[in-house]
């Protein structure tokens, strides 16, 4: 055994860490691994560790996996091994870069990187797709297989048969394998592109119909004077999105009141909320409608703001060519449908008491400034576009748009965000594109992918997807909704002829590859990390250690493929991975002269760059000077009523964003057979499905089904019982967590668990996507992962 391997294995003794990891939120401040000195006292290899301490270097870096925090990770490296992970000390915290301390995910990366189950060699499939049977091959054979199949299949079907899938595990860096794969394909004829973000695509598509742009969020430092924050389906305490928690905790200490609207009593409710308001999933618009009714009927709306800046509030402010009784006031008062949108009406739909609705509406309207901040979970329903726009109407009625301390709601992306340049991308000769939600259809039968279904740039697709690259992405057979339908297409080798996957582990999706390649971790490659949401800094993610076994970065093997296709000089431009990062940094520096970015050599010393952004309020100029800064809508105003949506003439896309019962929502006839609504949440121990394979993090939060005591009692379910969750699409079996932290009528599981089917197709991993729907949303052509009806039963083993 090599000295380096011996040292690495000594760092992971077979002891339980459950007692440490159960500390929950305290993990943010605890070290997760023993120090080198502590290990030296327990292991023989620790002697070598102690003697090498003088040669140890501590490098500031960040993960470029699928996490938006980009926290400060301090990697302790000695003799080519990461021996410890710490984080930025309190004494080094900067007011402009607050809470750069690594969370539980960041502190556990060492186990993830050095886990013995990581893929080690390139392999090709020898069994049926999905069986997980592979044999080891050389890199020469692997890159030849890719080059030969690209040439053969492209010659037969054309370049539009090639598809690079959603690759979440690498999306946190500016230089990733999926980006460079697209570059390679564009140099050889192009590929079928996709649009839509599974994370927030519905709200990003809907918000511009109110404001003309999706960038409706303020920088968080403008919220210091906010008196009331309503977090609507927003759970930053667990998702850890940049600096959000830091600012919210400061506001809490300074007296800001927090209300959380969520079916689940999340950690955000526990840590921030003065009040928790649970409501049935997919009924958000009914609650919003009733709030608007109270605000208007009690004369609490901001009349001057509405008169000056909006279109569609009442009949007098409607656009031309629209019949009577289509305005917001007419809808709320029931002038057209005969139903007044009272809190009593909404209570029957949402299960929120009428008096709670009244008080919530009054509090929001009477408190200035106030911020209604919607998370991205509610917009992942098939009614999510309406929910996103509904929040913008509430912000508009109360005049909380374009002011410091307010929030325009909707998508919430900050309009002054800055990004690194990224690698240059040649033009894609293939002009058609599909929604990411159409990929199964495009692989199964391209004729079904019509403009109505989301096809752009062409009247039809000329080919099914025949070549698919899944590079560090676990979407194919895990994160994809209606998983069994997707797997059925993947298993049919007459459909997709060649699937290439690269990953760190044998994920459920990797099992369906024809060629499986061992990927490098962020510690074994060069990159630049950038935060999501706040986007206040860039941080260098430097290669710290050499890859073990035969692991290679995507870019490394892509250069070999490019050489075999005769395009290596155009593809690489003669640059190594590190040289690409230097080039990207220089391009970023030139594109932002006002930022005065350091040279790359200086960056290697400083490690990060803090943007010099000033406090930013979305639509501040539009409100201050509407004459010279009209809203970028057709009317130049905030469009409460959207004539563009009205002209689509689709009842599922109302011109006024209001409540329409959701497919598979609580009012659907299917609820008689499947009476419980299932939702998922993003947990603190992984980002989507990334790091699921880390055993330390599995102990942080065991995969269970949350069920309310009332629903459990009706089904004879007790704490810890094995239960089966089922609907018309699949069956999932996990232990029950009987808790009042979930409202009656709703059950919940953490998202991102790996699919683990048995011989009968029953999932034992807790992957909710065996139950979720692939129905696309009507406007964005996006995902509706969260809209699920299920039934739950105690499982009695026959043994």
Predicted segments with their positions:
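Extended redox/cofactor-interaction regions of prokaryotic respiratory oxidoreductases
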Residues: 2-7, 177-261, 285-286, 348, ...
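N-terminal export/assembly segments and adjacent metallocofactor-ligating motifs
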Residues: 2-300, 471, 759-799
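Glycine-rich phosphate/diphosphate-binding loops that line cofactor/substrate pockets in enzymes
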Residues: 143-162, 219-228, 338, 358-371, ...
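Long, well-ordered, tryptophan-enriched scaffold segments
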Residues: 266-367
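Short beta-alpha connecting loops at secondary-structure transitions
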Residues: 273-279, 537-547
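Active-site phosphate/pyrophosphate-binding segments
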Residues: 324-443
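Phosphate/diphosphate-binding loops
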Residues: 497-498, 543-562
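Long, contiguous, secondary-structure-rich segments that constitute the structural scaffold
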Residues: 554-603, 690-691, 695-706, 710-799
């Amino acid at each position: 055994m090599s000295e380096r391997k011996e040292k690495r294995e000594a760092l992971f003794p077979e002891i339980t860490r459950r007692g440490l990891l159960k500390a929950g939120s305290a993990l943010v401040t605890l070290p997760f691994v023993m120090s080198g000195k502590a290990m030296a006292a327990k292991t023989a290899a620790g002697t070598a560790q102690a003697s090498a301490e003088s040669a140890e270097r501590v490098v500031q870096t960040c993960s470029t996996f699928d996490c938006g925090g980009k926290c400060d990770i301090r990697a302790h490296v000695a003799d080519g091994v990461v021996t410890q992970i710490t984080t930025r000390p309190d004494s080094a915290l900067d007011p402009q870069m607050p809470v750069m301390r690594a969370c539980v995910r960041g502190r556990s990366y060492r186990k993830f990187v050095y886990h013995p189950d990581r893929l080690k060699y390139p392999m090709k499939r020898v069994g049926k797709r999905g069986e997980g049977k592979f044999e080891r091959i050389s890199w020469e054979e692997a890159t030849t297989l890719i080059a030969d199949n690209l040439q053969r299949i492209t010659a037969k079907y054309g370049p539009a048969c090639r598809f690079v899938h959603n690759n979440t595990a690498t999306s946190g860096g500016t230089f990733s394998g999926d980006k460079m794969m697209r570059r390679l394909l564009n140099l050889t004829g192009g590929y079928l592109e996709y649009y839509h973000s599974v994370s927030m695509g519905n709200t990003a598509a809907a918000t511009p119909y109110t404001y003309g742009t999706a960038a409706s969020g303020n920088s968080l430092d403008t919220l210091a004077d906010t008196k009331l924050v309503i977090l609507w389906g927003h759970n930053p305490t667990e998702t850890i999105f940049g600096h959000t928690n830091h600012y919210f905790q400061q506001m809490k200490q300074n007296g800001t009141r927090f209300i959380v609207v969520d079916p689940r009593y999340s950690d955000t409710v526990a840590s921030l909320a003065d009040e928790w308001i649970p409501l049935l999933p997919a009924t958000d618009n009914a609650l919003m409608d009733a709030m608007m009714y109270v605000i208007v009927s009690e004369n609490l709306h901001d009349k001057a703001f509405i008169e000056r800046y909006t279109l569609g509030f009442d009949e007098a402010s409607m656009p031309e060519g629209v019949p009577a009784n289509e305005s917001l006031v007419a809808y709320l008062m029931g002038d057209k449908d005969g139903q007044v949108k009272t809190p009593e009406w909404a209570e029957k739909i949402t299960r929120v008491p009428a008096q709670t609705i009244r008080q919530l509406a009054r509090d929001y309207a009477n408190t200035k400034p106030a911020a209604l901040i919607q998370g991205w979970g509610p917009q992942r329903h098939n009614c999510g576009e309406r929910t996103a726009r509904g929040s913008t109407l509430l912000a508009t009625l109360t005049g909380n748009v374009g002011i410091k301390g307010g929030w325009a709601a909707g998508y919430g992306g900050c309009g002054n965000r800055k990004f690194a340049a990224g690698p240059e991308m040649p033009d894609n000769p293939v002009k058609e594109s599909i929604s990411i939600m159409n990929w199964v259809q495009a692989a199964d039968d391209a004729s079904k992918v019509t403009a109505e279904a989301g096809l752009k740039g062409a009247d039809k697709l000329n080919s099914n997807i025949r070549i698919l690259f899944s590079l560090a992405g676990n979407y194919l057979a895990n994160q994809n909704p209606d998983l069994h339908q997707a797997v059925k297409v993947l298993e049919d080798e007459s459909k997709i002829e060649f699937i290439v996957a690269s990953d760190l582990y044998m994920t459920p999706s990797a099992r369906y590859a024809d060629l499986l390649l061992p990927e490098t971790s962020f510690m074994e490659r060069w990159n630049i990390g950038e935060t999501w949401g706040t986007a206040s800094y860039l941080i260098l993610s430097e290669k710290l250690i050499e890859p073990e076994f035969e692991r290679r970065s995507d870019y490394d093997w892509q250069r070999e493929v490019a050489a075999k296709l005769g395009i290596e000089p155009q593809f690489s431009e003669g640059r190594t991975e590190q040289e690409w990062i230097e080039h990207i940094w220089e391009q970023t520096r030139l594109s932002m002269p006002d930022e005065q970015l350091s040279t790359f050599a200086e960056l290697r010393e400083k490690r990060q760059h803090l943007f010099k952004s000033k406090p930013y309020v979305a639509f501040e100029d539009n409100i201050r000077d509407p004459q010279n800064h009209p809203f970028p809508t057709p009317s130049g105003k905030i469009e409460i009523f959207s004539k563009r949506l009205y002209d689509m003439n689709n009842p599922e896309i109302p011109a006024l964003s209001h409540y329409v019962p959701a497919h598979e929502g609580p009012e659907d006839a299917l609820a008689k057979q499947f009476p419980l609504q299932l939702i998922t949440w993003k947990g603190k121990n992984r980002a989507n499905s990334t790091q699921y394979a880390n055993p330390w993090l599995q102990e942080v939060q065991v995969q269970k089904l949350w069920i309310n005591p009332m629903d459990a009692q009706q089904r004879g379910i007790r704490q810890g019982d094995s239960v089966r969750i089922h609907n018309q699409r699949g069956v999932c079996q996990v232990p029950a967590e009987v808790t009042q932290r979930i409202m009656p009528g709703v059950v919940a599981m953490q998202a991102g668990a790996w699919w683990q089917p048995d011989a009968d197709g029953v999932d034992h991993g807790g992957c909710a996507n065996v139950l979720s729907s692939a129905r696309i949303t009507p406007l964005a052509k996006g995902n509706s992962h969260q809209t699920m009806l299920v039934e739950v039963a105690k499982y009695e083993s026959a043994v």
